[in-house]
Amino acid sequence: MTTTTTEVTFSTTTTGVGIITLNRPKALNSITNNMVTAMLQQLKQWQNDKATSVIVFKGSGEKGFCAGGDIKTLASAKEGDEQFNNAKQFFVDEYELDLLLANYSKPIVSLLNGVVMGGGVGLTQGTSHRIITQNTKWAMPEMNIAFFPDVGGVHFLNQAPGYTGMYLALTAKTIRAADILYIGAADFYVEDLRVLEQKIVDYDWTTVEEADHKLDELIGSLAAVPPRGELAALQNDIDDTFHLYSVEDIVAKLRDRGDAFGDEHANILLSKSPVSLKVTHKYMLDYAHRSLEDTLNMDVVVAMNFLRNNDFYEGVDAVLIKKHQSPNYDYPTLEEVDDELVDSYFKA
């Protein structure tokens, strides 16, 4: 059986597999509100369907699983109350979907090929079996558009080793296979997702009592070791600098090092929105031990406050629309972003 919308497709097999395919390859499968609504409805239906035992989650095309939310549409929120309310509804629904996927009662195999960023990470971070390849490019890149790592990012980035989560949140660095495994953002590395998907689809799940264990066995038979990554070797440098209690102190510490790591990363931070840096830094510290649900609830509050302020629209315009890379922020320096302003982003 196959159900199709223009942007996401759902199908089932006689072997007990439900398949979700994000279907906007020209937009790197970035998700729209229609897609989110459709997935919520279908996943709730499958949850109560005894004929469906395993979910496979993938993106169409060769370039990516999902590049995130449809940010250009969200950027229209400044045009009026209707657009603003539509943006809020998107966030509410998206975060509900993220929580449903993370708490789903059946195993979900996420095939993370190519670009997996932002909202794409949020969709799959809590799923039971996250599979990556040599082509996977993973990031929480929201800092690049004067936003913050939403979709529960503060929750799962805080679970990474040492201060790697803070590092990735503030720098928006893109990481590859070994580093994705290192921070706990994937479970298996395989050479060929097509072979794995075919094995899953061909296996008869209708007679299996513990599908999770059988999936571990099946995927494990194809698992490989990825090329060496970078984060483990940088762990001491990251912990030496990104543990500090203000963004200004982090930048100063990086500058004081007088080495390539310090210079590179000080410049990276100073290229970001000062508001985004400070709000994200505080959020990472204050919510380090909060649940995913608590974090997603706060994400709605923080996201809407970003949409009430101009710097987000400047960031989107500079990076995604006009692409001149020179945003004219209302708060262009860290010193201009005081604690009162930062605190206001956490108030509904």
Give residue spans per PLM region:
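Glycine- (often His-adjacent) and acidic-residue-rich active-site loop
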Residues: 59-93
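Short, flexible helix-coil linker/hinge segments at the edges of structured domains or between repeats
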Residues: 83-87, 131-160, 200-204
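Long, low-complexity C-terminal extensions of enzymes
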Residues: 249-264, 269-348
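Conserved CoA-thioester-binding segment of acyl-CoA-metabolizing enzymes
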Residues: 1-58, 99
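Contiguous mid-protein beta-loop-alpha structural module that forms a pocket-lining wall or clamp
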Residues: 152-210
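Hydrophobic/aromatic residues within transmembrane alpha-helices
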Residues: 57, 70, 123-124, 180, ...
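Glycine-rich beta-to-alpha active-site loop
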Residues: 101-145, 168, 172, 177, ...
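Amphipathic alpha-helical blocks and their helix-capping loop/short-beta junctions
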Residues: 185, 191-268
